[in-house]
UniProtKB/Swiss-Prot annotation:
NCBIfam families registered for this protein in UniProt: eL43_euk_arch (TIGR00280), PRK03976.1 (NF003058)
Gene: rpl37a
Localization annotation: Cytoplasm
Family of the protein in this entry: Belongs to the eukaryotic ribosomal protein eL43 family.
Protein name: Large ribosomal subunit protein eL43
Pfam family, one: Ribosomal_L37ae
Listed GO biological process terms: translation
GO molecular-function term, one example from the UniProt record: zinc ion binding
Gene3D superfamilies linked to this entry: 2.20.25.30
Binding annotation for Zn(2+): 39, 42, 57, 60
Quaternary data: Component of the large ribosomal subunit.
A single Gene Ontology CC term: cytosolic large ribosomal subunit
Keywords recorded for this protein, A-Z: Cytoplasm, Metal-binding, Ribonucleoprotein, Ribosomal protein, Zinc, Zinc-finger
Described purpose of this protein according to its UniProt entry: Component of the large ribosomal subunit. The ribosome is a large ribonucleoprotein complex responsible for the synthesis of proteins in the cell.
């Protein structure tokens, strides 16, 4: 493995290649894709990325389709909140 420093973090493996601004963009993406997320089924922080858009919970063993780099996409969150709001209006 290549040496990483405090400043560059996970993108230290690229060395001086590709330019600083591109490495900063990739750093943001790689940190979010390697992070563990909270499972929406069991509530534990065990949701990890298996492949592009496929997320697996190590606790309840659920496999969920999500975003490519993050568990929830912004459009999915918007749709979920709209559905929840419509259900609440229907119940009233």
């Amino acid at each position: 493995m290549a040496k990483r420093t405090k400043k560059v973090g996970i993108v230290g493996k690229y060395g001086t290649r590709f330019g600083a601004s591109l490495r900063k963009m990739v750093k943001k993406i790689e940190i979010s894709q390697h992070a563990k997320y909270t499972c929406s089924f069991c509530g534990k922080t065990k949701m990890k990325r298996k492949a592009v858009g496929i997320w697996h919970c190590g606790s309840c063993m659920k496999i969920v389709a999500g975003g490519a780099w993050t568990y929830n996409t912004t459009s999915a969150v918007t749709v979920k909140s709209a559905i929840r709001r419509l259900k609440e209006l229907k119940d009233q």
